[in-house]
């Protein structure tokens, strides 16, 4: 978490390097936010974070697919989405969606880690391809 001044300072020195803002982690839900002292719900917090990123002229945003529609209204640049799963196994993630759901919600890029790397990588990639081609 960072304030506007820090974001602007990072952007100022970033040169050609793209600066990407990360909103609320997909491992958090509204209950988790309250536990760590936030008085806003996830949608409110993400909206606030995106407004800061926009003011700082960041190049992209990382957010859950659950908030992509909110982010798209506020931020017209690329959106990167973690928390992608093909099944109900969420591991430590609390807010997950399928690749198709993320695409339908408007995500530009998907971060898919454990669903590929856990187990047989080739088979897992094929499962993703099959899912996307349905």
Where are these regions (language model features)?
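Conserved anion-binding
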Residues: 1-69, 76, 80, 86-89
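Glycine-rich loops and low-complexity Gly/Arg-rich segments
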Residues: 43-48, 103-107, 134
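Acidic (Asp/Glu)-rich catalytic clusters
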Residues: 11-15, 72-73, 99-106
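Glycine-rich phosphate-binding active-site loops on the catalytic face of alpha/beta enzymes
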Residues: 1-6, 86, 95-99, 103-124
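Conserved, mostly hydrophobic/aromatic
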Residues: 53, 71, 102, 113, ...
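Short, electropositive alpha-helical surface patch
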Residues: 75-83, 125-134
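Short glycine-rich, acidic/polar surface loops and turns
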Residues: 67-71, 92-101
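Generic secondary-structure boundary/loop-capping signal
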Residues: 22, 81, 93-94, 113
